[in-house]
Amino acid sequence: MTQKKSVLVIGFEPTLLDFSSPEFAAFPGLDAAKVLQALKADEARLKDLGCDVELCLIDLGETAETVVRDRLRRKQFDCILIGAGVRTIPSHFILFERLINLLHAHAPQARLCFNTNPGDTAEAVQRWL
């Protein structure tokens, strides 16, 4: 990457999630502390690669769209990642769909990418920058 790229990483505030739920069976051993640790590590990695990174941790839907919309109004992003917890957990599918449409309307210039777990965020972003 030759110039500093701006990246928005959208994911659930991990302390709001019930990792013991059957919906999280695909992520054995995951908990809020591990998610936050992985996000912070990937944030640091992306910064080391020259990216300007912002974490946008959202709730389970009550204010999520407003929080993301406010971020998009403040700044233009080159790449936006929506985390696997938002994207892959069936009970969050409608919120994921609403966020995609929000990004389409308010950040049409941004590349969209998706991680498969909290530890591969940097790789997902690098695919599109």
What are these language model-derived features?
Residues 54-63, 115-117:
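Short beta->alpha junction loops
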Residues 65-101:
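Mid-chain, well-packed structural core segment of small domains
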Residues 19-21, 66-67, 93, 125:
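Short, well-ordered secondary-structure micro-motifs
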Residues 25-44:
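Short catalytic helix/loop segments, enriched in acidic residues and glycine
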Residues 38-39, 95-129:
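Ser/Thr/Gly-rich flexible loops in soluble cytosolic domains mediating phosphotransfer, phosphorylation
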Residues 1-25:
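N-terminal, charge-rich interaction modules
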Residues 44-53:
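A generic structural motif
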